Structures are given as C-alpha cells and as structure tokens.
UniProtKB/Swiss-Prot annotation:
GO terms for molecular function: DNA-binding transcription factor activity; transcription cis-regulatory region binding. PANTHER family: NAC DOMAIN-CONTAINING PROTEIN 86-LIKE, PROTEIN CUP-SHAPED COTYLEDON 2-RELATED. Residues 185-195, 429-461 have a biased composition (Polar residues). The keyword Transcription regulation applies. Gene3D superfamilies: NAC domain. Residues 183-198 are annotated as: PEST-like. GO terms for cellular component: nucleus. The NAC domain includes a DNA binding domain and a dimerization domain. Expressed in the epidermal cells of the root apical region. It comes from Arabidopsis thaliana. This is NAC domain-containing protein 82. PROSITE patterns: NAC. Keywords: DNA-binding, Nucleus, Repeat, Transcription, Transcription regulation.
Length: 489
C-alpha cells in the first residue's frame, strides 16, 4: 500500500479495543483489513528515529502504529528479544488489560527505549505501547495469538507522563499555503457571487436563513445544479440580498439568467429554473397532442368498449362451442377421456386407437410403432385393426404364443406349426419347412435343426417323407438293424 497523506485534523486514532479486536485479531487470523493503515515492521531491527518514515500514514502526527512479528530471545523460552543495534526496549510498569464489555480481550505493555547496552543504557523519550491479543475463543481452539503484536510508538515531551498530552502534528500554515484556492464565501459587504460552472463553486448566503440549504441539509453546491447548467454557459448570475428574498417573486427564467431560492425550499427553486415548454414535453390535464408517425390511442366512452360484441343472452346455452375448429392447440376437459395422437405425447393408456386416424378404436389394439398396444388381443400390423383369427406379427415381437401362424399371411394357421426361421414353433408336432404346414406322416428334416425323432438315425429320408423300402415289413423303422450295428461299450 502506498503512503496516504491526510489533511489537517484527519488522523488514524483507533481505540484500544479496536486495535486489539479488529486490527490485531484479523492480522493474526490472516483476514483482510478494510483500510491498510498499519505497516508491518520488525521495529526491533531499527532505531526509533528511523521508524516514523516507515508508517503508511503521512499525517505528521507524533504517534505511529506498526504490526510487529514476535521474536523470542531464546528458542526454548517465552521472553521476547527487544534489543536493537544501538540500544534496547525496557519494560516499565505493569501490564494493563484491554476490556470489552467487562471482558479482558488483550493486554498493554509499556516499554521505554534506552540507548546503550543493558543494563547501563541511557533512558530516552521514546515510548512504545505493545498490544497483544488475549481471546478466550482462540485459546480454546488452540490458535496461536503471539505471532504479531501492535506497537504504538510516540515520543513524549520530557521525563514522566504528561496529563492531556497531544501527539497530533504541529500545524504549520505554510505547509498548506500552496493548496488550490477555493472560492471564498461572500461577505456582507459584497453579497454577490460569481457562478462559474467550470469550477467547484459553493453558493451561500451570508444571513443564517434556511433558504440557502439544499435538499440534503447543506449548502447549495455546484454538484446539485451542475447537471442543469448548459455546457456553454458563461454568463454570471447575481444572487439577491437576503433582505430582499422575502419580496422577490419566483422567477421562471432559465438558470443562466437568475438563481433564486424562495419559499425556503431549494427543490422547488431548482424546478422553477426550467421552462416547461422547452425542457419537458409532458401532457397537460385532459390534453391530447399529435405526434406525426405515432398512432394516438382511441378514447372510448364508458360503454364503448362493449361495441362490436354479440349479445350473449340470445346465444344458445350449449356446451359445444366450436371456438377453434380443427385445431390441435385447442383442448377441452372431455378430450382427456379419449386417446390423442401419439405424436402429441398425450394418449389414454386404457384404450387402443388407430394411429392413422388418431381416434379411439375399441376393436383394434395399439399400433406397435407407438409402443402402446393391447396385450390381450393380436392385430394385423398392416391394417392396425384387431384380428382375432391371426396372432401377432413376429416382426413386431408381439404374438400369441398359444397358436402358430403363417408368417407370409400373418393369419393363424392351426394346421401348421411356427416357422423355424422366426424362432416360434410348436414343439409337440413336426412340420414341413418347405410348405409351412403340419405333416403328421413324416418326422422333421434333421437338416433344419428342428427336433429329431429317435428313429431318425435309421430311416431313409426322401424329401421330408418316410421311405419304407429300406426296411422289412416287420421292422419298418429298422430298429433291428440299429441294434445289430450298435457299437459295443
């Protein structure tokens, strides 16, 4: 932080509680300070006359504040090392407590600088108050509180304390003579004042009249009226004498001509500075203005808003008003009892519907493409209607497992098992895979991968039929031959 220079009378003057509970505590805990007014300096490495130049605040006061890290004299001890290169700081008196709401929050120790070697050093006028934190909450949390102390350094006048001693900077008028000269307050002999918008000007009347106060309770300054002044205004204005304020009428002239403060209220006086015809284009009472290109609102009579509406009393009292015909955006409560189009995402899950019409069809199951169907009845996928004579199509994955069907027609065929290509077949009876019809006179073809009869290892197969010419009449299936050629175990 750069050093800050304060005007005369402004100084950093915290109380003991503020030094301990705010500045020192936040420094120990590593928290940010709103104002970085205390420099961190190891004061025991410097001589007292060198420390004032290290302060952040250049107020010229004879009291300086520093954050000082604690350095122990011995590594295993608790005593602090307070020796400098040319002298040492010696404790004097007893520690004083810092009380906050009758609770001890810190301790103050007074030290005096001695020039030379201990214990024969020469006492000087440099005094330091060392503030340390003593917080019970931090003690219970085992937070170290001796990492930093606040040192307040000052130089007293002569030996011993002085009652009412002040350590503010001695005021020297020549130090402030080169500051920017502001406009002086007009005297009673010259009641006029020049108003220059380009400078910071304070307008004031000499008499203690309330009329010279602005809306914030202070003097009228250029900050209140600078926004109202034209940028090119260079005309000076003359303020009336306070004695003539009561008899001076309110003026509606622009601010560049006359500035007055009548009626003890500057807010109204500033509003009177404007010309309503030029500054504000408002509407007068009951006045309608015409602006080209802007359509003016139509002013209707009290009952005029009902013009053009039909007579509701003559209309039929029915509940079927076709307000929006053939509109999918229009929805009534009665529509919730029937399924809607699946594309809208609204449907009645308790009833099937025809996906092509979007209407409920109690005779047909749901369309398999919508994922909504009646699992209790099959349907023809081409028509979308229920067909009790046919099972579900195997392509849809929905079928009646209690009956086979012809995959080419999609209709139930009670005389034929399921097609093996579909993976759906009747395991209780064989069938001819070429015809798709049940053939009770022949076993299954072993090349199809279907169930093989135990007799299939010894019969002659000819296009899906038995060939009885290969065995004798008494043993048409060749059981004797199979037993004769049975390998030995």
């Amino acid at each position: 932080m750069g050093k800050t220079q304060l005007a005369p009378g402004f100084r950093f003057h915290p109380t003991d509680v503020e030094l301990v509970r705010y500045y020192l505590k936040r420094k120990i805990l590593g928290k940010k300070l709103l104002v970085d007014a205390i420099a961190e300096v190891d004061i025991y490495k410097f001589e007292p006359p060198d420390l004032p130049d290290m302060s952040f605040i250049r107020s010229g006061d004879l009291k300086w504040h520093f954050f000082c890290p604690r350095e122990k004299k011995y590594a295993s001890g608790v005593r602090a090392n307070r020796a400098t290169e040319c002298g040492y700081w010696k404790t004097t008196g007893k520690e004083r407590p810092v009380l906050c709401n009758s609770e001890v929050v810190g301790k103050i120790k007074t030290l005096v600088y001695h020039f030379g070697k201990s214990p024969r050093g020469e006492r000087t006028d440099w005094v330091m108050h060392e503030y340390r934190l003593d917080d019970k909450v931090l003690t219970q949390m085992n937070v170290p509180q001796d990492t930093y102390v606040v040192c307040v350094l000052f130089k007293k006048d002569g030996p011993g304390p002085r009652n009412g001693a002040q350590y503010g900077a001695p005021f020297k008028e020549e130090d402030w003579s080169d500051e920017e000269v502001r406009t002086d307050v007009p005297s009673t002999s010259n009641p006029t004042n020049l108003l220059e918008p380009s400078k910071e000007t304070t307008l004031a009347l000499t008499a203690p009249d309330d009329s010279n106060k602005d809306c914030f309770g202070g003097m009228i300054s250029e900050s209140c009226v600078s926004d109202f002044l034209p940028a090119t205004t260079n005309t000076t204005s003359e303020l009336p004498h306070p004695s003539d304020a009561a008899t001076t009428p309110m003026s509606t002239a622009p601010l560049a001509e006359t500035v007055q403060t009548p009626n003890n209220d500057d807010l109204y006086s500033m509003l009177d500075l404007f010309d309503d015809d030029e500054e504000f284009l408002g509407f007068n009472n009951n006045e309608v203005r015409y602006d080209p290109g802007v359509s003016a609102p139509v002013c209707l009579e009290e009952e005029g808003i009902f013009n053009g509406l039909p007579e509701l009393s003559s209309m039929p009292r029915t509940a079927s008003y076709d307000l929006v015909e053939n509109s999918e955006l229009y929805l009534e409560l009665q529509d919730l009892t029937a399924p809607l189009n699946p594309q809208t995402g609204l449907q009645d899950l308790t009833a099937p519907f025809n996906p092509q019409t979007g209407l409920q069809d109690l005779t047909a199951p749901f369309n398999h493409q919508t994922g909504l169907q009646d699992h209790t009845a099959p349907f023809n996928p081409q028509t979308g209607l229920q067909d009790h004579t046919a099972p579900f199509n195997h392509q849809t994955g929905l079928q009646d497992l209690t009956a086979p069907f012809n995959p080419q027609t999609g209709l139930q065929d009670l005389t034929a098992p399921f097609n093996p290509q579909t993976g759906l077949h009747d395991l209780t009876s064989p069938f001819n895979p070429q015809t798709g019809l049940q053939d009770l006179t022949a076993p299954l073809n072993p090349q199809t991968g279907n169930r093989n009869d135990p007799r299939s290892s010894s019969f002659l197969y000819n296009q899906g039929h038995f060939d009885f010419s290969g065995g004798n009449d008494d043993d048409p299936y060749g059981f004797s031959a199979s037993m004769r050629h049975r390998p030995k175990m």
